[in-house]
Design a protein with these regions (language model features):
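A general, composition-driven signal for non-globular sequence regions
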Residues: 1, 145, 162-163
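Bacterial N-terminal signal peptides that target proteins for export
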Residues: 1-10
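C-terminal motif of bacterial Sec signal peptides marking the signal peptidase cleavage site
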Residues: 18-20
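Bacterial signal peptide processing site
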Residues: 22-24
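Beta-strand-rich recognition domains
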Residues: 27-137, 156-327
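Short, surface-exposed beta-strand/strand-loop-strand elements in extracellular ectodomains
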Residues: 136-146
Length: 327
């Protein structure tokens, strides 16, 4: 007979009782998939790697940025950490990027005249944007893909973009907190093999637009989850605030919650009224005080009035879509 992974979990628990052994105190207690009552599709365990690494750092070290696929109980295949345009999209101009030896100590050392200008409206205003993402971003203006991050995972970097557009216009951003353990939302970090990373996105634009609580942010992939009853949904928010963020050496059976991204989410006419407002995080929350890609140009980030934003859980939410209308 065929034993499912859920039956295997139950049998292993019985075996522990029979032999008198007990699981390690570091082993998280994994709930049953039937405990989940929300709108997400649930997967469990490690994904199958379909792309081993999207990026090699030419100068220094970088975390492996793989892409995987995992199938839920209904047979739907999910891409983790998210579908992306890193390999094919237009790359943003490097503000600070160690792998390309672009390491200016201040904005005065940056040749901003070399930044290419993406055209949304030929007769529009030319706007410059300064972006720092932990880890990865894809920027759309009125549905047009303007630029993608030049580093999917690490080392931390920052970028400049330029585009011509007429007001009003819509900024839409896909942000991804990358993962080493594909499908499990975690990485080998802080002495644990399965430790959840954190995200964060901040940007300012030359027309005065800055990231803040008036932006919208919706979650589309949350992991690692060990107790599915910790997930909830209230007023459009996909919440995981009651879920543990502690690292472990035994996280291979963690769950993940997935929501389908709308095909036209980046378009100006997309209706995002049901999406919650973005959550704001401090520089200490994101941990950028030792990141030169941020600190060397802080006048264009928090110094310009911008705030770090994400969804309601900057640790467990790994794929987030952001939107903002500039009037």
């Amino acid at each position: 007979m065929i034993i499912t992974k859920y039956q295997a979990l139950a049998l292993s628990s019985v075996a522990l009782l029979v032999t008198g052994c007990s699981p390690s105190s570091d082993t998280p207690s994994v709930s049953n998939i039937s405990d989940y009552q929300g709108s997400a599709s649930i997967t469990q365990g490690l994904a199958t790697t379909v792309e081993s690494n999207l990026f090699e750092c030419a100068n220094g070290r970088s975390r492996v940025a793989g892409v995987g696929e995992i199938t839920d109980s209904e047979g739907k295949v999910w891409t983790v950490p998210a579908k992306n345009n890193f390999s094919t999209g237009p790359k943003a101009f490097d503000l600070y990027e160690e792998c390309s030896n672009t390491t200016p100590s201040s904005l005065a050392e940056v040749d901003q005249s070399s930044v290419p200008v993406a055209i949304v409206d030929q007769d529009g205003e030319e706007i410059t944007g300064y972006i720092f993402a932990d880890n990865y971003f894809e920027l759309y203006i009125n549905g047009k893909l303007i630029a993608v991050d030049t580093v999917p995972f690490t080392p931390f970097n920052s970028n400049i973009v330029k585009f011509k557009v007429k007001k009003p216009y819509t900024i839409a951003v896909k942000v991804i907190d990358w993962e080493e353990n594909l499908g499990l939302g975690s990485e080998d970090n802080r002495g644990k093999a399965y430790h959840a990373g954190d995200g964060g996105f901040i940007a300012s634009f030359s027309d005065g637009t800055v990231t803040g609580p008036d932006w919208q942010a919706q979650t589309f992939y949350t992991s690692p989850i060990y107790d599915l009853t910790c997930l909830s949904e209230v007023d459009g928010k996909r919440l995981s605030e009651s879920c543990t963020t502690e690292g472990t050496d035994h996280g291979q059976d963690a769950y993940a919650a997935h929501w389908e991204t709308p095909n036209n989410w980046m378009n100006q006419e997309f209706d995002s009224m049901s999406w919650p407002q973005a959550s704001v995080y401090s520089e200490d929350d994101i941990g950028v005080n030792n990141k030169k890609a941020y600190m060397n140009f802080i006048e264009k980030f928090s110094g310009a009035g911008a705030s770090f934003i994400w969804s309601t859980n900057v640790v467990l939410d790994n794929e987030v879509l952001l939107r903002y209308e500039v009037k």
